[in-house]
């Protein structure tokens, strides 16, 4: 015998598929929405429906936006020779809140995670390498999260960039590749950039070291 209406069950199942939301939380969210006015529910529904319909990926940095290129890549006030590599678009929001970073970004949309079958080919590392090959990038800042997967991703990218520089020629030959740096102190091991405050992120960016 079905106790809950099918529409309620379906919404609970949908919420449960979201990361970090278990069945109990999904149930609480669903029953909360039952008490929300229909106009608010309609606005919520429209926001979800338009989430992908009205957003695009920037062809330069793979951030999300309403236009391609995105507002950051299109800005004349940005230093295009300085590229900060992040795991997700939400990390850009955290770094931008510091007001200190004036370069551009490259969004990987993930991190190397062998336990979940996510390798280098599943995230946008090859696009970063291509960007380095075709551009005039002075510095690459590796701002992946300071956890096991983030460190593995940073190490892999660093190795690929060093190999690329070696193939292009030695520094003395005038074919110097970009400096590769890693965000430094301030971020705890195992922490996520998304949850770091502005002061901590500013210290991490200013204290970055060559990788």
Name each region found by the language model:
Residues 135-148, 153, 205-211:
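Extended, charge-rich low-complexity interaction segments
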Residues 92-95, 114-116, 149-152, 190-193:
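Switch/connector loops and helix/strand junctions flanking conserved nucleotide-binding motifs
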Residues 150-162:
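Short Gly/Thr/Asp-enriched flexible loops that form oxyanion-binding sites at enzyme active sites
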Residues 2-9, 17, 30-92:
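Cys/His-rich Zn2+-binding cysteine-cluster or related metal-binding knuckle/ribbon modules and their
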Residues 177-185, 192-211:
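Conserved phosphate-handling catalytic cores of large alpha/beta enzymes
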Residues 26, 75-144:
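Extended interfacial segments that mediate partner engagement and assembly in macromolecular machines
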Residues 163-179:
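Intrinsic disorder/low-complexity segments
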């Amino acid at each position: 015998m079905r106790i809950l209406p099918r529409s309620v069950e379906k919404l609970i199942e949908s919420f449960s598929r979201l990361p970090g939301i278990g069945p109990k939380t999904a149930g609480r969210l669903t029953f909360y929405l039952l008490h929300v006015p229909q106009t608010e529910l309609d606005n919520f529904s429209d926001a979800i429906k338009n989430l992908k319909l009205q957003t695009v990926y920037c062809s330069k940095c793979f951030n999300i936006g309403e236009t391609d290129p995105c507002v950051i890549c299109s800005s004349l006030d940005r230093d295009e020779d300085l590229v900060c590599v992040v795991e997700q678009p939400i990390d850009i929001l955290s770094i931008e809140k510091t007001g200190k970073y004036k370069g551009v970004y490259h969004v990987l949309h993930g991190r190397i995670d062998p336990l979940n079958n996510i390798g280098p080919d599943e995230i946008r590392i090859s696009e970063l390498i291509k960007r380095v090959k075709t551009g005039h990038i002075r510095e690459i800042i590796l701002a992946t999260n300071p956890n096991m997967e983030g460190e593995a991703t940073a190490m892999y990218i660093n190795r690929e960039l060093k190999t690329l520089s070696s193939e292009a020629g030695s520094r003395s030959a005038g074919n110097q590749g970009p400096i590769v740096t890693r965000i430094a102190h301030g971020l705890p091991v195992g922490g996520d950039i998304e949850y770091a405050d502005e002061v901590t992120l500013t210290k991490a960016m200013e204290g970055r070291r060559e990788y």
